[in-house]
Amino acid sequence: LHTAYRRQRQMCIRDSFDGFRTSHEIQKIEMLETEDLKPLVDQQALSDFRNRALTPERPVARGMAENPETFFAHRESCNPFYEAVPEVVEEYMNEITRITGRKYGLFNYYGDPEADRVIILMGSATEAAREAIDYLREEKGEKVGLVSVHLYRPFSVKHLLAAVPKTANRIAVLDRTKEPGANGEPLYLDVKEAYYGLENAPLIVGGRYGLGSNDTTPAQIMAVYENLQLPEPKNH
C-alpha cells in the first residue's frame, strides 16, 4: 500500500488491522524478503519523500490557512486522484501475488463459485468465516461464500461487484463497529449503495461482530448464513 501511496502523488494510505485479536496473537508467519520487494519501490520517489519530511533542520510551514472562496473547489479537485487509487493498488497487489504466490485483491472471494448466500466483512474474522464455509460446503452441500475487503477507502464499487458471484441473492455485511443512531454501519451502507438501482439486486442485511475484542467463531458465522435462509432475515 505504501508503494502505491508514493506512486499516487503522495496520498495518505493507512494500514489497519483489528486490535488485540491480531496485534497480540502468537502465530507463525513467513516473512517476505527485502530483495524480492525492493524492485516494487521507486527509489527516487522514496528519496524525494524523505527529503520533504518535516525536520527542525529545514523548518517550513504548510497548509496554515485557506480562504472559503477556494477551499470548496480545492477539496473537490482531488477527486480524480482518489478515483485512480484502486487501480494503482490492484497493480501492486498483482505484483505481490506474482512474487509470493499469495492471491491479493481489493476484494477476495472464497467459497462456492455459484453461492446464493454471501457474507462481506474485513479483518481477522475472515478466518473463522472460511472455516464455516468449508464445513457448510463439505458437510451440508450449501452454496455459501465470503468476500474479504482489503482496500476499504477509496471504496471501489466496480471491484466489489466483480467479486460477488452473480448467483448471490442474499448478502450479509458484517461491521466491527457500532454507530448508535445510524441506519447502519459504514461497510453495510457502502455495500447497499453499491447495489442501489441495480436490476435484480440481492437482499442485503447488516450485522455486527467482535466488539470489545470478542472472538468471532465459525458457529457464529454459520448462524449468519442460517439467518440469510429465513423468509425475512433479521437486519442488524
Regions found by a protein language model. Name each.
Residues 24-31, 131-132, 159, 182-186, ...:
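Short acidic, glycine/serine/threonine-rich loops at helix termini
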Residues 15-108:
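Conformationally flexible catalytic loops at phosphate/diphosphate-handling active centers
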Residues 170, 175-236:
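Peripheral docking tails and interdomain loops at the edges
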Residues 141-170, 174:
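Core nucleotide-handling region used for phosphoryl-transfer chemistry
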